[in-house]
Amino acid sequence: MYKYAILTFLILTSCSKENLEFKVPTTSEVEKLIKHSDEFNQEVITFDTPGGKIHFAIGFGIANSIMVEGQDGNIIIDAADSRYDAEKIYELFRKKNSNPVKAIIYTHNHGDHTFGAAYYLDIQDYKPQIIAHEDTDYYVQRIIGILNPIITQRSARMFGTFLPEEELINVGIGPRLNVSKSPNGYVKPDLTFSDELKITISGIEIELYHAPGETNDQIFVWLPKHKSLMPGDNIYKTFPNLYTIRGTTHRDVTGWIESLDLMKSFYPEYLFPSHTRPVIGKNEINNIFITYRDAIQYIHDQTIRLMNAGYYPDEISEMIELPQNLSSSPFLYEFYGTVRWSVKSIFNGYLGWFNGNPAELDPLSRKEKAKRISKLAGGENELIKELRLAVDKEDMQWALELSDYLISLDLFNSEVKTLRQKALIHEGAKSSNPNKRNYFLSSALELNDEFELTNLMNIDDTFLNNLSIDTLFNVLSVRFKPEDHDGSLYKVCFNFSSGLVRSISLRNGVAVISNEAQNNCDLEVLTQEIELKRVLTGLKNPVSSISSGEIVVQGGNTEFLKFLAIFR
């Protein structure tokens, strides 16, 4: 990977996991989670619906993939998390029906639903239509662009991507994430819509509806003749992820409820979720919709009630529990989202990060607070003794908090690291919520000295052709290190062979991006979009691109390399 790359898919992972000592105790708390893995037994199930055959692939990656048979072609709903999984799934789909794929429908932007699409373009001459909500590509570009480093790292922890295989039970809504097993296969949609779209493809009547919920671009698919509904990620057999610990924009809980009510109004006889198994039967599906939406409304309404009573989010999260008649539903076991995290997210969504406590508006810095806690404990040595005592007593959450103070004091020695690792393993091992379990165990594994940075996701030109050049310029903006620039106005202009122009002006500590032609450029760069993408993603060394003439710099090749080096 070249040092000039600004878009890389990096996480902490191990080059030799098998050489690491990592023992996780078996606890009774995870028995339900182990049983939950039965939900993801790998298979393709065929359903003879009133409108025709629907094939349902489950257990290959996190998300399910669905194939609907048409008259002279088939439709894929959600394309799996990788070309690797898409190939395995389609080998089985093709045995059911070998007609070409006429269309791929993305229910939303998440990679486990979109990153396998390119496989279908690779295997047939006919290019399938890619259908999605009009905002789907925006969210894909955002995640793989400016937020890529932190979302990639936190997602890898949450999904247990680099845990030893024997320690990954499941990820709550699927068996595992396989995104690293092949180059990213995202393909931009070429047919989008805002609120609803009714279309007939290969004789199949399809109705698509915008249904904000787990994502803002979420849609659901209604096949009226099949009496079948595909809800995407708005319902699955676990408590909904009203907030995800990998990080996300605020999820509109009231919009999610409204979307569930809309789906319920169709009275489907077949429900094919994008995670967990299908549900058959109008009455059962109707009851599940009621239970699910009522649980979400309960959490929302009670959070608002207690917010208005003056409680803080951490207090509210301890006060609210689902009524027993709701919490006993298998669709509301906390195998993905939790009530506690949801409460805090709802509070933040309405009131923002400040909880209302004046002591927490401008608190002491982490380091200053750690110094004072250390002083209260009797000094740094006494603080370490308290950490040892907490671990001995298996008071592990307190141990984690104590180790935070020691880290802030730059006292993260081998003993503190070992004690923190024990606390993380203990807390993770006893959690029946896979998001928490995987995040804690992954964080513990990262503390091994053998860990180093490596790529999670492979990329190639197919991916780059679907990556907007503006995504890369936006990444440059947020990777600019002003301390590495002298502060003077400096303008670099890019002229692409397609006729597209972009410029970056460095001024006042920011990198200002423009899509208009500029005068008085310090550097002018002439190239193709794909070539700059290769350089900025590390597929090519800019020195070789300049030497070959694929990048021409007016104003100095060395100056251009220096310019690239200030984006980190």
Which stretches of residues belong to each language-model region?
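Sec-dependent signal peptide recognition
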Residues: 1-7
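Conserved beta-strand hairpin/beta-sheet module of binuclear metal-dependent hydrolase folds
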Residues: 40-97, 220-223, 227-232
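C-terminal motif of bacterial Sec signal peptides marking the signal peptidase cleavage site
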Residues: 12-14
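Active-site metal-binding motif and surrounding structural segment of the metallo-beta-lactamase
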Residues: 40, 46, 50, 72-73, ...
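Accessory terminal helices/loops
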Residues: 18-34, 148-152, 161-170, 174, ...
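Feature captures hydrophobic
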Residues: 389, 395-401, 405-408, 412-568
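Metallo-beta-lactamase
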Residues: 74-75, 81-83, 141-210, 255-267, ...
